[in-house]
């Protein structure tokens, strides 16, 4: 039997969400250019979602898309619409409406599943620029250096015992209890359960030092590892 020409499967991706607090082009345009300039290796040509929860009034979506495209960002959808007018404007611009997972539908109770031990992925070689390492359903341990432009992703914790220059995204499946441990933090980006800092947001006195990152009340916190 020949294979079907297409196959539809469920999957999940880690995406950056741009929260708009203003919809004026003259305000948004320079802010986008400045933000992409802070981490061009991570943000240039990156897919993003626009959240408009804090936007009052209408958005000129065609102009907004041109600005994002000019800054090197690809808008794949919009979240945070508060009324039908906003939703229709987004759809009219040809953009999908996305949900960020709040207010999930309740499911019927089921018998508890037998716990499965989380797997830990251990990488003992350098992680080069352009490489992506993903530890699904577990922790990720890297005993060597991580180059700029490399990406570490784990559903659990991330441990880096070399110099961390790339991107570290812990709690990728949404676990806010995940943590990041670095013996030398020089990262382009650190993220736990979707909350992230770019390099310029990492407190200066911890940059280049041994550091431990966690989430507290929904915000990233950092302290010395030793």
Swiss-Prot record:
Q: Which organism is it from?
A: Edwardsiella ictaluri (strain 93-146)
- What are the cysteine partners in each disulfide bond? none
Functional note? Cell division inhibitor that blocks the formation of polar Z ring septums. Rapidly oscillates between the poles of the cell to destabilize FtsZ filaments that have formed before they mature into polar Z rings. Prevents FtsZ polymerization.
The record ties this protein, via InterPro entries, to: CAP/MinC_C, MinC, MinC_C_sf, MinC_N, Septum_form_inhib_MinC_C
What NCBIfam families does the record point to? minC (TIGR01222)
GO BP of this protein: cell morphogenesis; division septum assembly; regulation of cell division; regulation of cell septum assembly
Its keywords, alphabetically, are:
Cell cycle, Cell division, Septation
Q: Which SUPFAM superfamilies match?
A: Cell-division inhibitor MinC, C-terminal domain (SSF63848)
Q: Which Gene3D superfamilies match?
A: 2.160.20.70, 3.30.70.260
Q: What is the protein name for this chain?
A: Probable septum site-determining protein MinC
Family, according to the entry, reads as follows:
Belongs to the MinC family.
- How does this chain assemble? Interacts with MinD and FtsZ.
């Amino acid at each position: 039997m020949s294979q079907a020409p297409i196959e539809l499967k469920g999957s999940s991706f880690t995406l950056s969400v741009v929260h708009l607090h203003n919809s004026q082009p003259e305000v948004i345009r320079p802010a986008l250019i400045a933000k992409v300039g802070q981490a061009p290796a991570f943000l240039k040509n990156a897919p993003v979602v626009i959240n408009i929860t804090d936007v009052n009034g209408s958005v000129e979506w065609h102009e907004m898309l041109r600005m994002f495209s000019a800054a090197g960002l690809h808008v794949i959808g919009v979240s945070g619409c508060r009324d039908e007018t906003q939703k229709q404007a987004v759809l009219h611009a040809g953009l999908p409406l996305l949900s960020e997972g709040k207010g999930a539908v309740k499911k019927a109770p089921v018998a508890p599943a037998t716990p499965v031990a989380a797997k830990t992925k251990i990488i003992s070689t350098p992680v080069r620029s352009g490489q992506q390492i993903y530890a699904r359903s577990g922790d990720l341990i890297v005993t060597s250096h991580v180059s700029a432009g490399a990406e570490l992703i784990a559903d659990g914790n991330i441990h880096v015992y070399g110099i961390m220059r790339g991107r570290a995204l812990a709690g990728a499946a949404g676990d806010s209890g995940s943590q990041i441990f670095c013996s030398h933090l020089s990262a382009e980006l650190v993220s736990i359960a979707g909350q992230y800092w770019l390099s310029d947001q990492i407190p200066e006195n911890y940059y280049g030092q041994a550091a431990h990152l966690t989430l507290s009340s929904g915000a990233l916190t950092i302290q010395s590892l030793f």
